[in-house]
């Protein structure tokens, strides 16, 4: 770990990373303070999660929480947000920089049963509560949630960007396949083998162009299409828009 964060800085890159918090030490927290821009801790509801958050905060590290929003976790998220607004003391840890909400996806260990539907009443209350209130930390969402957020009247559309896959980010698998997004890791429908192509060639390939065509062609009649571009082309069931066509 020390070697890679130092190497990043030497190359002019400010590293950020996400951790479960397991194995966090005061020494690692100090390295994060010295070399990292921010560290996100996944909200695993465990003793080591809380300990890592407090170690990072004590070291002066800009610390975020990554919270996966699913059918079974959205109610807890709403309760914690309400607690932080009304001051009842059962919210997120104090002095964090931000809570970033990540939409549950049915990939990897994620199950279809936990996918949130657009008409989920608790989820609708959750995003409307965020729309209407001010919190003691920043609120963020992953780009998968954008189709739901563009309908909120107090969220600046200029602060949102939809799916970045194949547009300004990509994912490299352990066996050197370039994918527009890690969600494609199982089917690898849009995979380019970096053993035979450079990253630039893969990025400009016909395979990646096919992936990007989704954003160009989706929902042509929608007045908000520039903000959403039809949402996720890999897992369409997570697109939170009742007007999608």
Language-model features: where?
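Generic structural signal for secondary-structure transition and capping sites
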Residues: 37, 61, 135, 168, ...
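Generic domain-boundary/flexible-linker signal
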Residues: 26-28, 50, 74-76, 110, ...
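A C-terminal junction/extension of Radical SAM enzymes
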Residues: 91, 95-187, 227
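Radical SAM/AdoMet-radical enzyme domain recognition
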Residues: 1-104
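A short acidic, often aromatic-flanked loop/helix-cap motif at beta-alpha or helix-coil junctions
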Residues: 47-48, 72-74, 106-109, 144-150, ...
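Flexible mid-to-C-terminal extensions adjoining Fe-S/redox cofactors in radical SAM and related proteins
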Residues: 177-178, 182-245
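A structural signal for well-ordered alpha-helical scaffolds and beta->alpha junctions
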Residues: 1, 49, 74, 119-127, ...
């Amino acid at each position: 770990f020390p070697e890679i964060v130092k190497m990043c800085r030497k190359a002019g890159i400010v590293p950020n990373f996400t951790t479960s918090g397991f194995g966090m030490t005061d020494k690692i927290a100090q390295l994060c303070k010295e070399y990292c821009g921010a560290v996100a801790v996944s909200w695993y509801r465990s003793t080591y999660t809380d300990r890592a958050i407090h170690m990072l905060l004590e070291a002066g590290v800009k610390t975020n929480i990554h919270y996966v929003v699913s059918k079974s976790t959205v109610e807890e998220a709403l309760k914690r947000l309400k607690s932080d607004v009304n001051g009842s003391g059962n919210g997120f840890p104090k002095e964090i920089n931000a809570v970033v909400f990540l939409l549950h996806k049915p990939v990897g260990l994620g199950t279809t049963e936990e996918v949130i539907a657009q008409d989920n009443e608790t989820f609708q209350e959750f995003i409307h509560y965020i729309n209407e209130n001010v919190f003691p930390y920043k609120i963020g969402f992953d780009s998968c949630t954008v189709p739901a957020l563009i309908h909120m009247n107090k969220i600046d559309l200029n602060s949102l960007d939809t799916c970045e896959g194949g547009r300004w980010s990509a994912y490299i698998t352990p066996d050197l396949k370039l994918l527009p997004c890690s969600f494609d890791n199982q089917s690898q429908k849009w995979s380019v083998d970096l053993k035979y192509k450079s990253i630039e060639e893969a990025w400009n390939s016909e395979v990646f162009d096919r992936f990007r065509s989704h954003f160009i062609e989706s929902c042509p009649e929608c007045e908000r299409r520039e903000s959403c571009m039809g949402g996720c082309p890999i897992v369409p069931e997570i697109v939170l828009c009742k007007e999608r066509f």
